[in-house]
Amino acid sequence: MEANAAVDGTGNPIPTSAVLTASAKHIGIRCMPENMAFLKCKKNDPNPEKCLEKGRDVTRCVLGLLKDLHQRCPKEMDAYVGCMYYYTNEFELCRKEQEAFEKVCPLK
């Protein structure tokens, strides 16, 4: 398995920093309800145990999204993730790959 791979051999997402950074805009849009529910829970209850299920909801959403993105645009996602990995998550150096990724897998 390559260090810059977005998924493992079985097609499950590998949430490395490069994968998460490359997918951050999509995560922010698609998983907003889960993230907001988790943040609201954390704000309202200082007991971490009370928010574990909300945290699992966020994780489930992100992993599902990563799998979906990789199924819909594997070549573009792998190129963008590979660039982000190579350049240590420097967006400015990966704009060409980002544009290709967002063209095939648009933000919605």
Swiss-Prot record:
Alphabetical keyword list: Disulfide bond, Electron transport, Mitochondrion, Repeat, Respiratory chain, Transport
Disulfide cysteine pairs (residue numbers): C31-C61, C41-C51, C73-C105, C83-C94
Chain location of the short sequence motif Cx9C motif 3 per the record: 73-83
Span of the annotated motif Cx9C motif 1: 31-41
GO cellular component: a single term: plastid
Domain of life: Eukaryota
Motif Cx9C motif 2, residue numbers: 51-61
Residue span(s) of domain CHCH: 28-69, 70-108
InterPro entries recorded: CHCH, NDUFA8
Compartment(s): Mitochondrion; Mitochondrion intermembrane space
Motif (Cx10C motif): 94-105
GO biological process: mitochondrial electron transport, NADH to ubiquinone
Family membership: Belongs to the complex I NDUFA8 subunit family.
Function summary: Accessory subunit of the mitochondrial membrane respiratory chain NADH dehydrogenase (Complex I), that is believed not to be involved in catalysis. Complex I functions in the transfer of electrons from NADH to the respiratory chain. The immediate electron acceptor for the enzyme is believed to be ubiquinone.
Assembly behavior: Complex I is composed of at least 49 different subunits.
Domain-related comment: Contains four C-X9-C motifs that are predicted to form a helix-coil-helix structure, permitting the formation of intramolecular disulfide bonds.
Entry protein name: NADH dehydrogenase [ubiquinone] 1 alpha subcomplex subunit 8-A
Organism (species): Arabidopsis thaliana (Mouse-ear cress)
